[in-house]
Amino acid sequence: MRLKIKNLLYQNYLILLAIILVGLFLRTYQLRERFLYSHDQDLAGWFIKDVVIDKHLRLVGQETSTQGIFIGPFFYYLQIPFYLFSHMDPIGGTYLVTFLGILTMVSIYFVFSQIFDKKVGLIGAFIYAVSFYTVNNDREVVPTMPVILWSVWFLYGLNLLLKNEQKKAFLVFGILGGLIWHINFALILALVLIPVTLYLSGKKLEYKNLTSGLIAIFITSLPLLLFEVRHGFQQTKAVFYSLTTPQSDTVFTGYEKFQRVWYLMSKNIHGLFMGTFPWLSFESVSIIFLAILIFLIVKKIIDRRLLFLVVIWILIYIFFFSSYSKIVSEYYLNGVTIIWILTFSVFIWQLLKRSDIKHFGVMILSFFFVFNLNKFFSYDINASGYVQRKDIVSEIKRNSNDRGYPCVSVSYITDPGYNLGYRYFFWLLNVKTAPIGNDVPVYTIVFPLKPIFVTDVNKGAIGLIYPNHESYAKERIEKGCSGENSNLTDPLFGFTR
């Protein structure tokens, strides 16, 4: 009997290892070419430079799209060892998110196995490893990337609470609660489930069990507390203002806003599972998943208390963002992605358990695998990311060095916002810049390429126009370059020094 159990465990771990290797390949294949480098990643580089080079410990990360609210610094600090490993190159950030992606696969396997069965854990890890949606999520070097990792451990905490393991549960909640500010403010919505779960557990709260959780949330929230005290509770006021004052969404109101949220949630579910499967709309897929949830409820396959929590979890997100005044993006709803993975995993597990319908489960997983791989390999690679931006700045450095220019000026022919995401490379490659108008050679970056703009060098979708070298006198260039490096002194949108 023991030998049989050991063989099963060994088999499960081999399957998990294979899943991890597939997931690792999908997250590292063409790592540089598929690195979506833009302003957010540029800001991360400046944060890390500020800490590592300038020895300035920071309490906040970049400013969010809501004025006065900053993301926490934890994700940025996590990138530091990877930046050091890559000699301060931003590619180091991709190593971190790859590691976090693998950690999420293992976490899903562990948590699903604890709540249900190891087969459910393997199915969940497989879905996360292969899904085009989660693969892309794990390639984005942004603080919101670990949302699904946070969610799976929050689910674990809820399960602990249902089993009356309050001390462990509140330790988990304490750590996760403090990390919300560092990852995504929308995760705070899930905290409503804690008192609901406590009620469903049928056991009263033992206050002594809160101690470890309170200590954990204090430690993880310490940067926020220090920042708020130093800055007159700036973020607290900004959060209150954002929740009580209409902001930027004048396009969708009332029922239209609800439709918008439902559409985005349906789009996320479709992206999570369907790959290039052509015959189902976004809304059709969401209806199928609701039908699966109802099936699991009717058949009593999942603990009714856990199912109740799952439904409440979904409804909280739908109703909150249907009434939220700000324009809602898809990633705001990533906090419920783990629910869709869980639902699908349990459903497939039920199919695989029965020999008469097992082939349907195998067929669905096979289609899932094929259509998601097809989308991954047929996806058009962004031609204005890490490789192209670094190459453009490298070309400016090469050409200016060949001409003996002590510094350069840089202009942009592009839409507002697309001129961002280059400055860290100018620092990394040691290119000194000066303001335009200082009689300094002006290099012009063009995006996107258009026939009316004749470029000298193209890197992907980004072009470069050289200065008219003959029109710049050496003495005037030296005088124009005698000041400070404007790349280091000019304000940087979203970054506070």
Q: Across the structure, where does each feature detected by a protein language model lie?
A:
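Catalytic lumenal/periplasmic loop and adjoining terminal transmembrane helix
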Residues: 361, 366-481, 486
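Short helix- or helix-capping micro-motifs
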Residues: 23-26, 124-129, 177, 181, ...
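Signature aromatic-anchored transmembrane alpha helix within multi-pass, membrane-resident enzymes
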Residues: 17-20, 215, 348-375, 385
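Hydrophobic/aromatic-rich transmembrane helices and adjacent perimembrane loops
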Residues: 138, 307-353
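Membrane-interface transmembrane helices that cradle and orient dolichyl/undecaprenyl
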Residues: 115-116, 154-170, 180, 199
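Transmembrane-helix motifs of polytopic, lipid-linked glycan transferases
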Residues: 95-115, 153-157, 292-299
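Short acidic/glycine- and proline-prone juxtamembrane loop motifs at membrane-interface regions
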Residues: 133-146
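Transmembrane-lumen/periplasm boundary regions of multi-pass, lipid-linked membrane glycan transferases
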Residues: 33, 45-54, 64-65, 161, ...
